[in-house]
């Protein structure tokens, strides 16, 4: 069935056989693997000192070539109205830090077109995140569809660019970026409303939320104290040392604060229980 020109969807613009061919190109095991390894789709990308600038295309180079060939063959015989366009409604990036909040550094994230040698942000859609701002969600919306063409030796498509700045003294991973998007391909294109890049700061996960009640906190402290006493003072098949027991009992008895530097103060410091989880 020849191109009808009545729909923007690829399925209605070409025969069922050719749309099936395109599905095989996009969702073959090899294509899915390439999307993960070359584009980091849905995977965590680590920002390190030796990888301060990351450019990740939204379509693998091999897949890009096959899709472009598919559209070109349909265009040459008159079945398709163009050589193909790539459309990405939205790119969503989840950014988390992997160092303490006092580390001085930032990330600059933006969407670029590989057809641009300068890799400038598309329509100024660029977000800067300081380390203490993280975690955060970042979103981009391209304002046009990208032609499936080759410019010089570059396969033209959209790409996510991440730049790491600062973090002096931190050579390892300082932030993790997980990007998700859904690329679409059609023989017709469009322009879209300009929407500024979105930046939503996210509250860090409170893993102690279930232990905010006093009873839960008391149970946690009691279990920690019991563990310490057991590990230090319970001896198998032996009589408990009287001195050790008396010092153990001091943990549960409130006493006036001792003078700094006194022997009692140093002894209480030595047997002060370790409290976990910031409690």
UniProtKB/Swiss-Prot annotation:
GO biological process: transport of virus in host, cell to cell
Keyword Transport recorded: yes
GO CC annotation: host cell plasmodesma
Transport listed as a keyword: yes
Extent of Low complexity compositional bias: 254-268
Region feature Disordered, mapped onto this chain: 246-279
Keywords recorded for this protein, A-Z: Host cell junction, Transport, Viral movement protein
Subcellular compartments: Host cell junction, Host plasmodesma
InterPro entries noted in UniProt: MPV
Cited function: Transports viral genome to neighboring plant cells directly through plasmosdesmata, without any budding. The movement protein allows efficient cell to cell propagation, by bypassing the host cell wall barrier. Acts by forming a tubular structure at the host plasmodesmata, enlarging it enough to allow free passage of virion capsids.
Family (UniProt): Belongs to the cucumovirus movement protein family.
Protein name listed in UniProt: Movement protein
Species, as recorded: Cucumber mosaic virus (strain N)
């Amino acid at each position: 069935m020849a191109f009808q020109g009545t729909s923007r969807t690829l399925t209605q613009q070409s025969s069922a056989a050719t749309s099936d061919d395109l599905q095989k190109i996009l969702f073959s095991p090899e294509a899915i693997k390439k999307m993960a390894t070359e584009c980091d789709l849905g995977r965590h990308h680590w920002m390190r000192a030796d990888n301060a600038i990351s450019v990740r295309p939204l379509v693998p180079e091999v897949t890009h070539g096959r899709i472009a060939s598919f559209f070109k063959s349909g265009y040459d015989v008159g079945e398709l109205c163009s050589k193909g366009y790539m459309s990405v409604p939205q790119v969503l990036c989840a950014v988390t830090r992997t160092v303490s909040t006092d580390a001085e550094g930032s990330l600059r994230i933006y969407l670029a077109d590989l057809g641009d040698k300068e890799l400038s942000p598309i329509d100024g859609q660029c977000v800067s995140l300081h380390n203490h701002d993280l975690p955060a969600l970042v979103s981009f919306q391209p304002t046009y569809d990208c032609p499936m063409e080759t410019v010089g030796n570059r396969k033209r498509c959209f790409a996510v660019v991440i730049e790491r700045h600062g973090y002096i003294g931190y050579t390892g991973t300082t932030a993790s970026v997980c990007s998700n998007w859904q690329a679409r391909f059609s023989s017709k294109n469009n322009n879209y409303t300009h929407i500024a890049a979105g930046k939503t700061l996210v509250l860090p996960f409170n893993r102690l939320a279930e232990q905010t009640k006093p009873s839960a906190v008391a149970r946690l402290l009691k279990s920690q104290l019991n563990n310490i006493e057991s590990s230090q003072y319970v001896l198998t098949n032996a009589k408990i040392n009287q001195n050790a027991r008396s010092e153990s009992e001091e943990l549960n008895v409130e006493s006036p604060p001792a003078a700094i530097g006194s022997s009692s103060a140093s002894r209480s410091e030595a047997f002060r229980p370790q409290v976990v989880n910031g409690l």
